[in-house]
From Swiss-Prot:
It comes from Clostridium botulinum (strain Langeland / NCTC 10281 / Type F). Keywords: ATP-binding, Kinase, Magnesium, Metal-binding, Nucleotide-binding, Thiamine biosynthesis, Transferase. ATP binds at residues 115, 168. Belongs to the Thz kinase family. Its EC number is 2.7.1.50. This is Hydroxyethylthiazole kinase 2. Substrate binds at residues 39, 195. HAMAP family: Thz_kinase. SUPFAM superfamilies: Ribokinase-like. One of its GO terms (molecular function) is ATP binding. Pfam families: HK. It catalyses: 5-(2-hydroxyethyl)-4-methylthiazole + ATP = 4-methyl-5-(2-phosphooxyethyl)-thiazole + ADP + H(+).
Amino acid sequence: MEIRQNVKFKKPLIHYITNPISINDCANMILAAGAKPIMAEHPLEVSEITSASKSLGVNIGNITDNKMKSMLISGKTAYENKIPQVIDLVGVGCSKLRLDYAKKFISECHPNVIKGNMSEIKAIYGIKSSAKGIDVGACDIITEQNFDENIEMIKRLSMETGSVVAATGVVDIISNGTYTYIISNGCEMLSMITGTGCMLTGIIASYISSGNILEGTALAIVLMGICGELSQHVKGTGSFRNELIDNIFSISDDIIIKKIRINSY
């Protein structure tokens, strides 16, 4: 839990270029995690902003020409200055434009973390997926039958890119090619409001800011899953969203340790 406490103490500046659908919730989630967000996306300022930040997050959920340009500028700046960065492959299987752009970003910016659902991870790896827009396709959901196969694919993608790969879903798989974690926390309501994946990327960006990439990514995913479980008692999705942010802000280390469900593979 040292990573979490360091973020709360140091309050690192996190540069997050995300989509307008979830930008407000993402900024609030970064604040709840203990860091400070800046959501700048103008091409003429993003290099300067990234250089002054401790971590970078980019999200391709709602791309525009300017945003695509800005993310590449920031990604290259982060790589050149050894600033940790994470790319969220939102809807990467939706279009050739997104897929080609994501591949270009990964090859030129070398993000420390590549995050997506299993449909998105399969698409970036080059395997046909059954994505439904930004949602994971039914055929891509991790099951007992395809569990080992998917883990091997995630490990290969990690080794090929040099990035930690985080595949999120009913079961979350995080790997750096050598060490692999399986996380089973979470709840269905996390998939019933828009932007929870984008919010998670903001927490990942916050927790990898110290340079502890694999453990920071895993801790962020564990935290979101547990806080989802703690928030699901509410009467509806609007209340769930607010409760989720509150729990990210207030949860104790003792509760995380008590409720964590993580295994090494």
